[in-house]
Regions:
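Membrane-proximal helix-turn-helix segments that form the acceptor-binding/catalytic region
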Residues: 1-17
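Alpha-helix capping/helix-boundary segments
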Residues: 10, 23-25, 104-105, 168-169
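Short hydrophobic beta-strand element within catalytic cores of glycosyltransferases
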Residues: 151-154, 161-165
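Conserved catalytic-core segment of nucleotide-activated headgroup transferases in glycan assembly
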Residues: 12, 30, 34, 39-134
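Short acidic/histidine- and often glycine-rich active-site loop of Leloir-type glycosyltransferases
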Residues: 166-175
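Acidic donor-binding loop of glycosyltransferase active sites
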Residues: 15, 133-147, 158-161
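Acceptor-binding helix/loop patch of EC 2.4 sugar-transfer enzymes
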Residues: 1-5, 57, 67, 167
Length: 175
């Protein structure tokens, strides 16, 4: 409670407090609606991609991108691979689930022995661009976590359709 009161005192003294999304602003306003707060988007790109493949009939597979040192990412892939992907494979035989990210754990690596799951691990920027343009969907099956998800913003930037949870979409009003 001490640090909470210090933080609130500082916010009252400040002309404005900045947060990464409206989610944090709503949380602050639930505590004290008089605090002046604004959101600064964490997703600004200085260029726009022009080579996005619009012919989705030529695309195949599902893509997940995220570092596995972050527990919500490991949980998301394990849950999706074990609980969701088998049902998808029943309806779409031959579909592949590509898993990209650094610090792949043994448990994640073992998923690669399952039919249709391809553990890519860390890839170059060029290979990542190719995967974004080749896959039909990016999946962001996060079950917990907070704030704006860079993986969602990156998928949008690459023109990839996204299927996510409310946690994955948090902080991005147009998702």
């Amino acid at each position: 409670d001490y640090w909470k009161s210090v933080e609130l005192t500082m916010m009252h003294k400040a002309a404005v407090s900045y947060y990464p999304s409206y989610v944090e602003i709503n949380a602050i306003h639930a505590i004290d609606g008089s605090i002046h707060a604004k959101a600064i988007t964490a997703y600004v790109y200085d260029t726009f991609l022009s080579n996005i493949q619009d012919d989705f009939a030529k695309r195949e597979g599902l893509l997940f991108v995220g570092g596995f040192a972050h527990p919500p990412n490991a949980d998301a892939v394990l849950w999706f691979a074990r609980e969701i992907f088998p049902a998808i494979r029943k309806r779409i035989p031959g579909i592949r689930f590509y898993v990209v990210g650094s610090k792949v754990t043994g448990e994640i690596q073992a998923l690669g022995q399952e039919e249709g799951i391809v553990i890519k691990g860390f890839v170059s920027e060029e290979e990542l661009k190719e995967l974004y343009s080749a896959c039909k969907l990016v999946v962001v099956p996060l079950r917990y976590g907070a704030g704006v998800k860079g993986k969602v913003v990156e998928a949008i930037y690459h023109g990839a359709p996204i299927v996510t949870t409310s946690t994955g979409a948090e902080g991005i009003p147009f998702v």
